[in-house]
Regions:
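Hydrophobic alpha-helical transmembrane segments
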Residues: 1-78, 96-102, 110-226
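Glycine/small-residue-rich loop that forms an oxyanion/phosphate-binding "nest" at active or ligand-binding sites
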Residues: 83, 93-94, 103
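Carboxylate-dense, calcium-coordinating segments in secreted/extracellular and ER-lumen proteins
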Residues: 90
Length: 226
């Protein structure tokens, strides 16, 4: 039951999927981050299912397909990651000291650099999805739990920017060593599946899957450095 409560906390926090309300107490928070990749699994399944249906059973254009695929993660998560991304772009682009960046992160207003960053993000995502074919979708679907596994590892491994806030709540409540092991297993499984699917498609796809995994790891390292 406790693990189900942890699952409910993870899904309710990082998605708009309705789940039963549970108490955010110490026992329920211990393993909540273990289930962060579950949100990615749900997103990936929706991406694969809807994307495959659009490409194989409809005559929709590339732009419509790309727009739908770009919006699915936003609708599933409620935009929580985009909100953090926009705040981070504003803070980094200020080139201020640590205190100024933290102040910008707390500011509810959206700055010019956040708008520019979001425009760049959606332009890139639209462009990438416009080139997708149905046989690419399984590998693409695995990226969502992989990214959340790496994000969860950072939560229980890296020092927080400040000593308060929602992220600190998840850090303080987690059984860090066990959660880290579970998330590493998640990441290895996702990476392994991506490489296997690439191998089934041929050598070029193995290289492509490896490149995606490498890019995710580079972002993870950059996040630690940042």
């Amino acid at each position: 039951m406790r693990l189900l409560n942890s699952l409910a906390i993870a899904i309710s926090m990082y998605s708009k999927i309705p789940v039963p309300t549970v108490d955010w107490n110490e026992k329920n928070m211990k393993y909540a981050m273990c289930f962060f990749p579950v949100v990615g699994v749900i997103t990936g399944i929706l991406q694969f299912g809807i994307g495959y249906a659009l490409l194989e059973y409809t005559s929709c254009g590339k732009f419509f397909f790309a727009a739908v695929m770009s919006l699915i993660p936003v609708l599933v998560t409620g935009g929580i990651h985009l909100d953090g991304y926009a705040d981070t772009i504003d803070a980094i682009s200020s080139y201020g000291d640590r205190e100024k960046k933290l102040q910008i992160l707390k500011d509810p207003h959206t700055g010019a650099f956040a708008v520019i960053g979001l425009c760049v993000y959606f332009t890139a995502v639209l462009a990438l999805w416009s080139e997708a074919e149905s046989y690419m979708l399984p590998i693409a679907a695995c990226m969502y739990p992989l990214s959340r596994a790496l994000s969860g590892i950072s939560v229980v491994s890296f020092h927080p920017a400040k000593n308060s806030g929602l992220l600190r709540t998840f850090q303080d409540g987690a059984q860090k060593k066990r959660v880290r092991i579970v998330l590493i297993i998640w990441a290895c499984i996702c990476g392994g599946i991506m490489l296997y699917l690439g191998w089934q498609q041929g050598g070029a796809f193995v290289a492509g899957a490896a490149a995606v995994i490498a890019a995710a790891l580079l972002v993870f390292v950059y996040y630690h450095w940042m």
